Amino acid sequence: MPRTVIIDGDILVYKVSTGIVEEFEDEECIFQTVSWGNKEQAKQKVNDLIEKITKDTKSTDYIIALSDATNNFRKTINPNYKGNRKKIKPILWKFLREYLTTNHKTYEKPNLEADDVIGILATSEKIIKDDKVVWSMDKDFKTIPCKFRREFPNGTHESKIIYEDEADWWFMYQTLIGDRVDGYDGCKGIGDKTARKILGDVGEKSLKEMWIFLFLQMVMLFQSKQQKSV
């Protein structure tokens, strides 16, 4: 049966570009770290990794999801988004992105991250019509309904199916509590306990019902604050 593996291109590029770079520091002066990487080694390694991922996921084809390299709608809305990340990309980052887009099957959309693109590819019945599986090393894929294979740095992996009701619940949960690592604070005053109380158990409410319930909770909270201020 035909199967396409949707590869997290950001993770792919980062894994390869950081794995073969050498660094040198001159500590006798005001030092600057100098890095260099071998382009041929990088191409060979990324080709080998794509082949391995395709084989490991028992896929017959692959597509690589990439982030828009210049714009990100989240940073337009929230300038603090991922503000704690290093500003300088690994030295082979740009080269590998260009190599992938020129020599491999890639997919990207303006203003979107690879995660968003993966969500589109995994849930669309028109773009990829056959069986699909997502590959990444990122833990934050609970919000996408899909077959998912997560690789760990030590070489082990985890394979699971994320069902739609579970994905919807985690989407709402993360919307409420935020993600401090990425610089998104979520809804003020709502932590894990309150979020779980609002949402209930996985599958208890549909996505629409969770949105309505949340909206009503916010209205009640606003009215309560208004009454206290009178």
Ranges and model annotations:
Residues 17-18, 75-79, 144-149:
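Short acidic, glycine/serine/threonine-rich loops at helix termini
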Residues 1-63, 67-68, 74-76:
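Non-catalytic, usually N-terminal nucleic-acid engagement modules in DNA/RNA processing proteins
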Residues 2, 31-33, 59, 83-230:
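Extended two-metal-dependent nuclease catalytic cores across DNA- and RNA-processing enzymes
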Residues 41-54, 70-82, 92, 98-99, ...:
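Intrinsically disordered, low-complexity, Ser/Thr/Glu/Asp/Lys/Arg-enriched terminal regions and linkers
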Residues 69-70, 139:
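Short, glycine/serine-rich, charged loops/turns that create anion-binding
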